Amino acid sequence: HPVNSIDVNSELKELLLSRGKWPLFTHQAEAINKLRDGNNVIVATPAASGKSLCYHVPTIDLLTEKRTNRALYLFPTKALAQDQLETFDDMADGLNIRSAIFDGDTLPEDRAQIRRYAQLIITNPDMLHLGILLNHRSWSRFFRELKLIVIDEAHVYRGVFGSHVANVIRRLRRLCRIYGSKPQFVMCSATIANPEDLSRELIGLPFEVVNQNGA
């Protein structure tokens, strides 16, 4: 069911309207409102239910509200990262948000610029570990201003790979504490039986669950 009971800035609303994405579905509005109330949120709804809007909308809000704010998106594959960068840039068209992918394909000469200027960094768990956390001193400004961390396709982080990613996230949270930030988390997953367990295993924080598909 579409729902209008949510405030987003007028420019963003116009953009969403022009792309046929407004009004939002109930599960999108629920996730965004829970996030605004200060919660960490896991959205576990079927494919093609518009989960990515649950994090693109708050990210755009956050990054237009204060230009120094930073956000981090984690995807398991480069193809997904590329898809969502294009979706984000299309949704944020004309809002002057600096977004960039930072992965193994990022040219060395671009890396310092991205580190310094990108408000939204899109990466994968391995690059987060090897390229960002291990060089955390040169990312200190990013960590200080980091407000939101998005983990999409979270259901793939199971078993050995899941344990590895959970360790990377723990390290990320520790560095955020050291640099004085306390980012919120949004996780998105396919429909799974126990989203609370997944979020606890992976992040180690309490999460609000959104799993009623309102599309």
PLM features: residue spans?
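Interdomain "pre-motor" coupling segment immediately N-terminal to P-loop NTPase/helicase cores
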Residues: 1-7
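Conserved P-loop/Walker A NTP-binding site and adjacent catalytic elements of P-loop NTPases
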Residues: 13-179, 183-188, 197-203, 207-215
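Canonical AAA+ ATPase core
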Residues: 193-195
